Amino acid sequence: MSNKKRIFFTGGGTGGHVFPGISIIQKLKELDNEIEFFWIGKKNSIEEKLIKEQNNIKFIWVPCGKLRRYFSFQNFTDFFKVILGIIKSFYVLKKYKPQIVYATGGFVSTPTIIASSLLKIKRITHEMDLDPGLATKINSKFANKIYTSFKESEKYFKNHKNIIYTGSPIRKEFLTPNPKIIKQLTQNTNKPIVSVLGGSLGANALNNLALFIKKYAEIYFIHQSGKNLNDLREDNYLRRQFFNAEEMASIEKFSNIIISRAGAGAIKEFANACTCVILIPFKKGSRGDQIKNAKLLKNQNACIYIDEDEILNTNILKVIKETLNDREKINSLKENIKKFNNKHSSTLIAKLLIEDIKETKSK
């Protein structure tokens, strides 16, 4: 084992599998500036882009194949990519000798977790969603510890002895949102602000929805579209492909209503912001994780839930206007979503990891 303190993070595919890791690294840097950080992910991916924007995190790519629950001829070629990913991860980990490998989810994390198991490196896998994905289910077979973002997730890991409910880490920018930023973005509007957020990869259904509802001039609309649409500003409408962390924190905190997908990371940010949300979970081609996330909130009256298949049959503008005019409903939704807040999650996890490093180095 190396004398240097090193932690390897691995995960990706969406921002929801990357931002929590960045949050943990931010907190670890505050608590112990001697730790070196590495991130293993896929080449030319969202995780590579996001990690390379950070300071002092070395990104290393490995081959990886998608893990599927259904038959596909790609399963055969992807199987060999997974094997290659395990082999490269093995040699990378053997070279750098980290004390911990931390998986944040996504199929890219599995080769590294398996390789770290072969090398007897301490392994932690963190399930961000309520319902574990296939990657986490596989990772859990090799992990020493499982961290969960929802208390309700523990039932999916009954056979594992070391499960810790940590919550989902939130980036430090979201803990102190700046009200001046939302004023700059909306040009000091006095109108109610409704923000449509498509996530790190964008969302066609939400993009189409935003283009429809922006015609209503009595509301100021903020639209985060992903790379499929160009940036645009109109009288009551601002569209950007991406907002930075400070901008997004201000948008989530000071918008009157947020319309969003139902990824676990986004939900935890909304809970931290204590905001009123309309959730339209991703359905087609997904494993249903966002639907379960959204229904958990719906059942606790913490969000307005709209099924993706019902978008065309739902008068979204009517829902928005009725909600804006119902102060009691807004207050109730805000109070209930606040129960899902884990603003101290990054600190908790960082302290656990520092203890793990001390324990490993003392052996």
UniProtKB/Swiss-Prot annotation:
A Pfam family matched in the record: Glyco_tran_28_C
GO cellular component: plasma membrane
GO molecular function: UDP-N-acetyl-D-glucosamine:N-acetylmuramoyl-L-alanyl-D-glutamyl-meso-2,6-diaminopimelyl-D-alanyl-D-alanine-diphosphoundecaprenol 4-beta-N-acetylglucosaminlytransferase activity; undecaprenyldiphospho-muramoylpentapeptide beta-N-acetylglucosaminyltransferase activity
Pathway membership, UniProt: Cell wall biogenesis; peptidoglycan biosynthesis
InterPro entries for this protein: GlcNAc_MurG (IPR006009), Glyco_trans_28_C (IPR007235), GlycoTrans_28_N (IPR004276)
GO BP, one annotated term: regulation of cell shape
Reactions catalysed, as given in the entry: di-trans,octa-cis-undecaprenyl diphospho-N-acetyl-alpha-D-muramoyl-L-alanyl-D-glutamyl-meso-2,6-diaminopimeloyl-D-alanyl-D-alanine + UDP-N-acetyl-alpha-D-glucosamine = di-trans,octa-cis-undecaprenyl diphospho-[N-acetyl-alpha-D-glucosaminyl-(1->4)]-N-acetyl-alpha-D-muramoyl-L-alanyl-D-glutamyl-meso-2,6-diaminopimeloyl-D-alanyl-D-alanine + UDP + H(+)
Subcellular localization, as worded in the UniProt entry: Cell inner membrane
SUPFAM superfamilies per record: UDP-Glycosyltransferase/glycogen phosphorylase
Enzyme Commission number: 2.4.1.227
Residues at which UDP-N-acetyl-alpha-D-glucosamine binds: T14, G15, G16, R171, S200, Q290
Keywords (A to Z) from UniProt: Cell cycle, Cell division, Cell inner membrane, Cell membrane, Cell shape, Cell wall biogenesis/degradation, Glycosyltransferase, Membrane, Peptidoglycan synthesis, Transferase
Primary location: membrane
Membrane topology designation: Peripheral membrane protein
PANTHER family: UDP-N-ACETYLGLUCOSAMINE--N-ACETYLMURAMYL-(PENTAPEPTIDE) PYROPHOSPHORYL-UNDECAPRENOL N-ACETYLGLUCOSAMINE TRANSFERASE (PTHR21015:SF27), UDP-N-ACETYLGLUCOSAMINE--N-ACETYLMURAMYL-(PENTAPEPTIDE) PYROPHOSPHORYL-UNDECAPRENOL N-ACETYLGLUCOSAMINE TRANSFERASE 1 (PTHR21015)
Record function comment: Cell wall formation. Catalyzes the transfer of a GlcNAc subunit on undecaprenyl-pyrophosphoryl-MurNAc-pentapeptide (lipid intermediate I) to form undecaprenyl-pyrophosphoryl-MurNAc-(pentapeptide)GlcNAc (lipid intermediate II).
The family this protein is said to belong to: Belongs to the glycosyltransferase 28 family. MurG subfamily.
Name of the protein this chain belongs to: UDP-N-acetylglucosamine--N-acetylmuramyl-(pentapeptide) pyrophosphoryl-undecaprenol N-acetylglucosamine transferase
Name of the gene: murG
